[in-house]
Amino acid sequence: VKSVKRTEFLAACVAAIALVFAAYAGSLDNSFHFDDSHVIENNLYIRSLDHVPQYFTDAHTFSSLPQNATYRPLVTLSLALDYARGGLRPRPYHVTQIALLLLTGALLVLFFTSITGELPALFAATLFCVHTANTETMNLISARSELLSAIGLLASFVLYQRSQLARRSSLYLVPLAIGALAKAPVVVFAPLLFAYALLIEKKSPRQALRIALPSLLLGIALLVFLNNMNAKEWESGGGSAWSYLITQPFVWLHYARLFVLPVGLTADSDWTAFAHWYDTRAVAGYAFIALLILAIRRAPAPVAFGLTWFAVALLPTSLFPLAEVANEHRIFFAFIGLVLAAATYVRTRWLAVAATLFLCVHAFATHERNQIWRNEETLWADVVAKSPANGRAWMNYGLTQMAKGEYADAKRNFQHAATLVPNYATLEINLGVVEGELGDDAAAERHFRRALALHPDVSAHLFYARWLTRRGRAPEALPHAREAMRRSPASAEARALVSRLEVAIGGAGSQTWPNYKSAFEAGLEALRNRDWSTAIEANRAALSRDPRSADAWNNLGWSLAQLGFRDESVRAYRKGLEIRPDDQRLANNLRLIAPAP
């Protein structure tokens, strides 16, 4: 494309921004998904900016699940800022996602312009921003790590390109180091810079290595630091390293296909690692890698650099086994290379027109794909249709039915999931919950106990404690609730349950009422709603203002009894009888709890 006037280019930039907004405007109220539950919804540490210093010293602040507590303080900080603006309403988080995407696009334009020229660079950046396969990264708020780390790496490239001072002083590495606080794979900057110097700047291999050496040393130091900062409980979740490795070439082929034709997108694949190196799919993957290497060797320099970027970006998640062999948010960073390669060929006006139409098609497809991410039910209905062998997907779809009160349907989905993942502790927890809702307490308890036997993590202890509490067995629940909180201090649910149970046995409450009357009436309302924990807290507050209220002692005793705190209930009734010895209601309630011998 011939050079364009500045006003025309700025108009094209405005149009590109409008296209990105059009693609993602419908996602603003999409709900939280996947890891968002423990990174955002149940994470106490994002609820106050007072915790900001702790984000940078303790990986447990990233997630309420210790096994997911990886060191990503920049992500946690950004989420805390979103929470400060809107609590747990999804919209502020999605607004930030779109803002970060636009910033990524702006950096891509700056980075690519010196390689391809302005309009091809703008096309590449816009394609990246509206590409339908990137919808997972945009809708999965906890995947913000991909956005932030990409921004850090791109900013380093732009500084390297455009500032002699930054290049001579190595200040271009500062954004890279900051981006590493969002996600470790930014350490691939060194091989990318080597490729850039070799292919784009036409340096010799020795010169390119000398240029990349400072970033290589920084990358190694960052990797060591980040690994040491991860919580000791953190788990990557990977299985056999060999099986995982021989599967990845086919996964790369799949990712490349998604770039060309993003159909069949699924939020949770049912793929598993290949058992044999000679699996037909594995062989197809090897052939793809060979063709990729051949293309890098023969393609024009910008295309070769883009293809190299694609390969290098995928190496960290390909060499180190992870829980899933393929994930669509892993392609976000890798696709930067592919959009560069594609844009290199947009050199004529007719191709520019075709490229514009192509962008509009992608924007429309992205808008439609965002509707799948509208809520948990729409998402998991899509996943079970596209990944029917995924037991976790069937379980999560069952959870959406349980949330609607469709317990029988939820149980059927859970039971189907059990045929696919028979020893999945989280599934056992959910079977326990649904059996409890269906009234089969014996079956519910079996499932909760099996979950504890399979994996006694915070969720197993917490959900068993909640069930025990609701069954009037709070004294048994309290040790499990405390264990859940010990394992995960960041868990809002565990902390809230422990607080309620400890208030029941005389601990300090968190709620305040201005006087006896308001506290007593709040206790009555809680009794009517069968909210025993609140009733206990309110009546204890009332008694702190009027310890001679026999009615408050009676209501406290009744609430304690419903939770199973028998001894505490007896003491409350006896206190009431000391005040009003002839109160027949107090006497009758006491006999129900402690009948005369």
Where are these regions (language model features)?
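Polytopic membrane enzymes that build or remodel cell-surface glycoconjugates and lipids
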Residues: 1-439, 456-459
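Residue-level recognition of tetratricopeptide repeat
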Residues: 399, 433, 466-467, 500, ...
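Short coil turns that delineate tetratricopeptide repeat
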Residues: 388, 422, 455-456, 489, ...
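Helix-start (N-cap) detector for alpha-helical repeat units in TPR-like alpha-solenoids
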Residues: 391-392, 425-426, 458-459, 492-493, ...
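Position-specific recognition of the canonical hydrophobic site in helix A of tetratricopeptide repeat
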Residues: 402, 429, 436, 469, ...
